[in-house]
């Protein structure tokens, strides 16, 4: 589908803003650019909308809710993206059931870490951006195009990031144009300036507990043989991160709150059922309960 009236944007009286100034029409294939030119107040503040509240003042960012740890692993024929559920506000727990993993189109998903408000808007706006492009152009973006679109959005947040409002996504997807379907899983990490890196090791993590999660995945990655084993390793990595990072939440058996995960393969992006995640989480906890029993509480340790 293509825009039938190439000159309509700059003359349509129903579209307020710079259209009346005689400026050239915006790139219609980019929804974010369209909003930036026509209705910037609808954009997140960091991406060109009106600045308000803590985003416009330094020193007020410490009490904003922050998302924490996201992990991604490749498996033969796809990739898994998973995240914990905790958000923190300073030294307080702001939320225990926060959703941090979002399916953005048929073959990609993003995980969010950093300032929660900005990160969630990234995920939602990015999903609209991909859908908007496909509706106008009639074809989906290539995976490289999807990476570049997200990098532009991250770069647009640089000014806010320098004030402490950092939000970093982790992009996972399946490249339908890859020559080898078994190796078509893709993981892309970003820095605050919009630079990106295509992971070749097979796993990546972002967030406050990422160093612990990556160490765990490094040791367990040899166990990944399919989607189910990849989900288990992802849950185990989040468990390890929660064990050492207070900002990362592990499986909460009492409240019934577990990590969320998405698998992406040739069949598309699919959310892993909560029942399966709960089952794997219990298996991990049970195995760790046996393996980690040492010290004064170990068998034979009583005097």
UniProtKB/Swiss-Prot annotation:
Q: Pathway listed for it?
A: Protein degradation; proteasomal Pup-dependent pathway
| UniProt note on regulation of activity | The formation of the proteasomal ATPase ARC-20S proteasome complex, likely via the docking of the C-termini of ARC into the intersubunit pockets in the alpha-rings, may trigger opening of the gate for substrate entry. Interconversion between the open-gate and close-gate conformations leads to a dynamic regulation of the 20S proteasome proteolysis activity.
**Catalytic residues as annotated in Swiss-Prot or TrEMBL:** 68
Quote the cellular component terms of the Gene Ontology held in the record: cytoplasm; proteasome core complex, beta-subunit complex
Entry annotated with the keyword Hydrolase: yes
Q: Which domain of life is it from?
A: Bacteria
Q: Which UniProt keywords apply?
A: Autocatalytic cleavage, Cytoplasm, Hydrolase, Protease, Proteasome, Threonine protease, Zymogen
Where is it predominantly found?
Answer: cytoplasm
Residues of the propeptide? 1-67
* E.C. number(s) listed in UniProt: 3.4.25.1
Q: Which reaction does it catalyse?
A: Cleavage of peptide bonds with very broad specificity
Q: Name one GO biological process term.
A: proteasomal protein catabolic process
Q: Which Pfam families match?
A: Proteasome
Similarity comment text for this entry: Belongs to the peptidase T1B family.
Function comment: Component of the proteasome core, a large protease complex with broad specificity involved in protein degradation.
Q: How does it assemble?
A: The 20S proteasome core is composed of 14 alpha and 14 beta subunits that assemble into four stacked heptameric rings, resulting in a barrel-shaped structure. The two inner rings, each composed of seven catalytic beta subunits, are sandwiched by two outer rings, each composed of seven alpha subunits. The catalytic chamber with the active sites is on the inside of the barrel. Has a gated structure, the ends of the cylinder being occluded by the N-termini of the alpha-subunits. Is capped by the proteasome-associated ATPase, ARC.
The protein's name is Proteasome subunit beta
The root-end lineage is: Bacteria, Bacillati, Actinomycetota, Actinomycetes, Mycobacteriales
Underlying gene: prcB
